[in-house]
Regions:
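A structural signal for short, hydrophobic/glycine-enriched beta-strand patches
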Residues: 3-168
Length: 168
């Protein structure tokens, strides 16, 4: 019992979770699409300060910029979310992501923004209509490394196949 209290178990467990999947070292010849699970933005502070405010999960967006440039013909779906009814947010995560992509000179007209989801399961449910990867299409799933195991599990249960691309 004493060892459990004094050892850095949380750090080890997070490390183990984050290392379940690794970034692909070699990509297929063609990437047909990528699904970016939203996070990394702070809509409330963005609205209050009038500037894009980012959070600790920003790598989901920043890394996706490199992927969009690397695979310019790939379909891109950003699954963000909407403010909850109790929230004071006037902007959604999708609104802030659009602002950020625009500032980074990414054409937001080439990105499909899904803005109805409120959790991981809904990310896939609402994005599924944009994704056709059951016929051998190669799609990347971009999300935080600590979130990837859960996201891949949900995707698999819904019959969606992805190449994991964990970030952060």
């Amino acid at each position: 019992f004493i060892l459990i209290v004094f050892l850095p178990n949380g750090t080890y467990l997070l490390w183990k979770l984050e290392n379940t999947y690794s970034k692909p070292k070699i990509f297929p010849d063609k990437i047909d699409g990528m699904l970016i699970l939203g996070s990394g933005t702070d809509p409330l502070l963005t609205d209050q300060h009038g500037q894009v405010t980012l959070t600790e999960s920003i790598e989901r967006i920043t890394e996706s910029i490199e992927l969009i440039k690397k695979f310019p013909d790939a379909k891109v779906v950003y699954s963000g979310g909407m403010p909850t009814a109790k929230s004071q947010e006037k902007l959604s995560g999708v609104d802030v992501a659009k602002m950020f992509f625009t500032r980074m000179k990414i054409d937001v007209n080439k990105i499909i923004f899904e803005d109805q989801s409120k959790d991981t399961y809904e990310n896939f449910i609402f994005s599924k209509k944009f994704i056709n990867n059951t016929d051998g299409e190669k799609w990347l799933l971009v999300t935080s490394a600590s979130h990837m195991k859960r996201a891949m599990s949900v995707a698999e249960k819904l019959g969606l196949n992805f190449i994991p691309y964990p970030v952060d």
